[in-house]
């Protein structure tokens, strides 16, 4: 939409600005909530940096997995860092890296998992605004009043009205964040806020995928993200009921409920 803002010799890429804003907002939210609830600030910082590294690696690794057939035809795709970042890969990579970090620090993972997930959803909302500015993750053509038209996008078709899937996703992410914060205020068992995120995000992402029209890989009639969404929902349901037993397994830190 308006991804590049040129000020003299400086070009500001709004996609990058939104990603950075999302990371910063997520960190500040987590630090603020963690401080109120007595969480170790150093651990939060550690999780934040590990999640960024794991998340960035995850986005690329899942992209490579999805694009194996194309990579076999053109190996140079491996070195194309301008494109190819899969959100679900970032979520999986960030969670895995954070888990490993908590294990090395002998901290219970579930309480911190709960603490950060509302902020993760908030950051995703910013990221989807970045997608809107760049024109990626675009929707199907529509004649509806809410359709948007891109004119200078390197990703979306220009000059035709499209369903604003990026804005729909952003709204969904912010709503999920609000719901998770409300749920966390009820002091549920450790692990259940994160479980709720997996279920809510999985359902929302599965639905939005039907509205998208960008190429993103498929498994049969479902997109790769829809298949992962099904796994996320199932995993979230299992985690919700297993959370009381899993919260302190293999950790020495005291279990906490995030409020």
Predicted features, each with a name:
Residues 1-259:
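A feature for loop-to-transmembrane-helix boundaries and adjacent hydrophobic helices
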């Amino acid at each position: 939409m308006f991804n590049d803002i040129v000020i003299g010799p400086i070009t500001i890429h709004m996609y990058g600005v939104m990603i950075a804003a999302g990371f910063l907002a997520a960190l500040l939210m987590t630090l603020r909530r963690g401080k109120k609830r007595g969480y170790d600030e150093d651990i939060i910082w550690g999780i934040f940096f590990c999640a960024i590294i794991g998340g960035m690696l995850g986005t690329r690794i899942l992209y490579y997995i999805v694009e194996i057939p194309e990579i076999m035809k053109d190996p140079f795709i491996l070195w194309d860092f301008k494109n190819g970042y899969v959100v679900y890969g970032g979520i999986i990579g960030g969670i895995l890296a954070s888990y490993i970090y908590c294990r090395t620090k002998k901290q219970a993972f579930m309480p911190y998992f709960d603490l950060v997930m509302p902020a993760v959803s908030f950051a995703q909302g910013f990221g989807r605004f970045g997608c809107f500015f760049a024109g990626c993750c675009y929707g199907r053509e529509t004649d509806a009043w809410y359709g948007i038209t891109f004119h200078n996008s390197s990703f979306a078709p220009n000059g035709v009205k499209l369903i604003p899937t990026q804005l729909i996703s952003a709204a969904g992410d912010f709503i999920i964040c609000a719901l998770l914060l409300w749920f966390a205020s009820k002091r549920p068992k450790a692990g259940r806020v994160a479980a709720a995120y997996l279920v809510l995000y999985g359902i929302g992402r599965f639905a939005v995928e039907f509205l998208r029209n960008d190429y993103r890989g498929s498994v049969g009639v479902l997109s790769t993200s829809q298949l992962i969404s099904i796994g996320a929902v199932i995993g979230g349901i299992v985690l919700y009921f297993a959370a009381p037993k899993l919260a302190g397994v293999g950790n020495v830190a005291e279990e906490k409920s995030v409020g």
